[in-house]
Curated annotation (Swiss-Prot):
Name the record gives this protein: Uncharacterized membrane protein BUsg_160
A GO term from the CC aspect: plasma membrane
Topological category with respect to the lipid bilayer: Multi-pass membrane protein
Family membership noted in the UniProt record: Belongs to the TerC family.
Chief site of localization: membrane
Regions that span the bilayer: 1-21, 38-58, 74-94, 110-130, 135-155, 194-214, 228-248, 256-276, 284-304
Species per Swiss-Prot/TrEMBL record: Buchnera aphidicola subsp. Schizaphis graminum (strain Sg)
Subcellular location: Cell membrane
Keywords: Cell membrane, Membrane, Transmembrane, Transmembrane helix
Length: 310
């Protein structure tokens, strides 16, 4: 399987390079959500699953191949769902710094590289830590439950001056930052001094938000399975998917706000799953079934509320 891991990793990097080369050449022509983007992402996703299943089937048989696919899909759904709040963070950052949509694309696409590198580091280091000191996973289990409860009961408490507070961050204390953006430049020279632009500030903040939101998503994926390739590849597609469907995801969350509570319930379920694993083991099929039931139920409830409003 080590050869499969290496070849598959090369495949993912190659696809990313091809994708990045294309999008950076035509940065102003890209739509953050379009039929072409969605078709490309979906085709890549299906192609990967098929190749993954075929190689595992050839090497270890159909039973293991089917199980690995279920592991991948469960990890992928977890990564998507637990990272989806990141989209709200992106909107808040862009709105606060007054970044036009045309330049938001550049930040998200450059940020794709940083997100993949950081999540890869977290995946490998997390897998090592949990294999050496398994009890650390129980700490995350308790953390997941507390986080979900905090979100359910205190999610409506907001600060009134969020947009002003973003300009009081450490970035503004340690760097010279221009008041306005300078086209698509990250750096500008003013009176022989180098300044960073709000566009670069937004890139830094979005990378930091990726780190924050990966704190729960990666341990959650590790609680489902410890296959590094599955964790890495599910992370890859989750990160790529959220960025390629940025506007659609934001629109969906805005019009289906109850879905945010589904994320809390899923996080709570994962927390309990980790804490009671010594007494009761959830099969991967049961785990995936619970996640889908929570999602479908909350979606239908939200849909009913939306229809009643109309």
């Amino acid at each position: 399987m080590i050869y499969f891991f290496i070849s598959s990793l090369f495949f993912l990097i190659l696809i990313t390079l091809m994708f990045s080369k294309n999008i950076f050449k035509n940065i102003k022509k890209i739509k953050l959500f379009s039929k072409n983007n969605f078709f490309f992402y979906f085709l890549l996703f299906v192609l990967f699953i098929f190749i993954f299943w075929l190689v595992v089937y050839t090497d270890q048989g159909i039973k293991v191949a089917n199980q690995k696919i279920i592991y991948f899909l469960t990890s992928y759904f977890l990564e998507i769902l637990l990272s989806i709040d990141n989209v709200f963070a992106w909107f808040f950052i862009f709105k606060s710094l007054k970044i036009p949509l045309i330049y938001q694309k550049k930040v998200l696409l450059y940020g794709l590289w940083g997100a993949l590198i950081l999540r890869s580091i977290f995946s490998f280091s997390g897998s090592f830590l949990f294999s050496k000191w398994h009890w650390i996973l129980y700490l995350f289990g308790g953390f997941f439950i507390l986080t979900s409860l905090k979100f359910i009961f205190f999610s409506n408490l907001e600060c009134d001056n969020k947009e002003e507070n973003i300009k009081k961050l450490w970035i503004y204390k340690f760097f010279r930052v221009t008041e306005n953006i300078n086209n698509e430049n990250f750096f500008v020279k003013i009176e022989k001094k180098i300044f960073i632009t709000p566009l670069f500030v937004s890139l830094i903040l979005i990378e930091l938000s990726d780190i924050v939101f990966s704190v729960d998503s990666i341990p959650a994926a590790l609680s489902v399975n410890n296959d590094l390739f599955i964790i890495f590849s599910s992370n890859f597609f989750a990160v790529l998917g959220l960025r390629s469907m940025y506007l659609f995801t934001a629109y969906f969350l805005k019009n289906f706000p109850i879905m945010k509570y589904a994320l809390s319930l899923i996080l709570m379920f994962i927390g309990f799953k980790i804490l009671i694993e010594k007494f009761f083991t959830f099969s991967i099929f049961l785990t995936l079934a619970v996640i889908l039931i929570i999602l479908i139920t909350t979606f239908l409830i939200n849909l009913i509320f939306n229809l009643k409003k109309c």
